[in-house]
């Protein structure tokens, strides 16, 4: 399936836009027909977060609300949500095609290999219809992942390009997609680390000193972060009359710290302070709803699902309690103060919680979170990691092993970042799944072909 063709010319490999031949047109047409076709079969879906994006909630990042507003302006109130799902499905089809076509040229895939990896990438998304709890494809849902998934796939493509062919242009393109991703999903702020690494690599390739390269990479990552923050603030100022960054990040960090706390931790703050009053009210709410780690069962699986069931109950209550003790413009500083104090006081509880969340995220990046799949996921990660490292050490399948290691590293970063705040919801972890399976398919089929090719020569 992933057999090798004669190497493409160097200029063709460096080309970022897709090259079209009959096979490429077939792949693109098939992806568009499948994704758009399933939309017409199932229609679009409204989820609990949809109203936040439509209403320009100050809690969410700027990109998706403005995307919906633009579609509403073009297609009208009656049909813009339908067109939103259509656009998301076409964009997803294009992003899958663009990545697979790029890998085709980089890895010199045969037509069969190219169509095989395209099928694998597309099938990973279609499996959402079977394995997610609501049996809905994300590109049909009116929420930010409808844009973020294809943007992430394109970030992978440009990251691979910027690492293999380091240049300022390629680093800037990767930074652009990181900016768009963070603009859609604050959870993906960890991609700033990718921007930092690519900026450093581009500068080192241009024979800059290590210090200059690090400074330039840091400046590029900082520029992406500051631009996202500025646009979030400007969007809230325009829509709500007050300029502040998206508040979702503040909410999840505080909710995690409180989830891991104990009732007596309110005494960490002076008796008449607003922080203490806030925590006492929240603890009374927790006693009623049971939404804290101290109320959770002990078993790993049960404990995780208890967290996922009640985390939003705690998080969504915090803003209501907070506004009784501090004005909205001071809410961020108020939240950070409490979160840092609680986290510093309960480091082991926080470590236990984030470790559980990390494990669940790692499993959900490749499978369903259950006892059997924990073992299978561990085997998958171990086998792919060892195989990629051995291939790299022996100097065989270097690009294939590099792709596999990159997939594992990006998964690690996503799991780590999610574990610190929001829980490892399936849709937060799905970003890594298509790349992991795509990279594993290419690596192991190429390895098998290499082994079978060597056998006749040895006998």
Protein language model regions, located:
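Transmembrane-helix motifs of polytopic, lipid-linked glycan transferases
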Residues: 86-111, 150-158
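Loop-to-helix entry region of an early transmembrane alpha helix in multi-pass inner-membrane enzymes
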Residues: 76-97, 138-141
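Extracytoplasmic catalytic/substrate-binding loops of multi-pass membrane glycan-assembly enzymes
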Residues: 37-71, 75-79, 244-245, 331, ...
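Lumenal/periplasmic acceptor-binding loop at the mouth of the active site in multi-pass
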Residues: 274-388
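Multi-pass, polyprenyl lipid-linked donor-dependent membrane glycosyltransferases
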Residues: 87, 127-159, 180-191, 428-433
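Membrane-interface alpha helices of multi-pass inner-membrane proteins
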Residues: 171-185, 221-232
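Juxtamembrane membrane-water interface segments immediately following transmembrane helices
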Residues: 44-48, 52-54, 218-319
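Membrane-interface transmembrane helices that cradle and orient dolichyl/undecaprenyl
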Residues: 153-171, 203
